[in-house]
């Protein structure tokens, strides 16, 4: 049976993650309060940020930037898209 939680990002009950997707206390917070659907939305947004800003994940500043954007996206006011970004779908 799938674990259900109240997702802080979606504002509704949804299927929970099967494991903590991030280390430490932040990972536990995500595991307990963010749904699989919201996590998948973050992964898509993160990919867009990495590509648009041409981030290198071996750069500590890039990882710090992505962590802050993840917190904003999942728990805060949201993460902004880069200036001038247009989706292929648009």
From Swiss-Prot:
SUPFAM superfamilies: YggX-like. Keywords: Iron. Transmembrane segments: none annotated. InterPro entries: Fe_traffick_prot_YggX, Fe_traffick_prot_YggX_sf. One of its GO terms (biological process) is cellular response to oxidative stress. One of its GO terms (molecular function) is iron ion binding. GO terms for cellular component: cytosol. The keyword Iron applies. The keyword Nucleotide-binding does not apply. Could be a mediator in iron transactions between iron acquisition and iron-requiring processes, such as synthesis and/or repair of Fe-S clusters in biosynthetic enzymes. Belongs to the Fe(2+)-trafficking protein family. This is Probable Fe(2+)-trafficking protein. It comes from Coxiella burnetii (strain CbuG_Q212).
């Amino acid at each position: 049976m799938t674990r259900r939680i109240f997702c802080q990002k979606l504002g509704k009950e949804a299927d929970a993650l099967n494991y903590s997707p991030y280390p430490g206390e932040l990972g536990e917070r995500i595991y307990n309060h963010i749904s699989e659907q919201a996590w998948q939305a973050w992964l898509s947004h993160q990919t867009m940020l990495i590509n648009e800003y041409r981030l290198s994940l071996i750069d500590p500043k890039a990882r710090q930037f992505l962590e802050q954007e993840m917190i904003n996206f999942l728990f805060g006011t949201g993460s902004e898209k880069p200036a001038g970004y247009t989706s292929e779908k648009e």
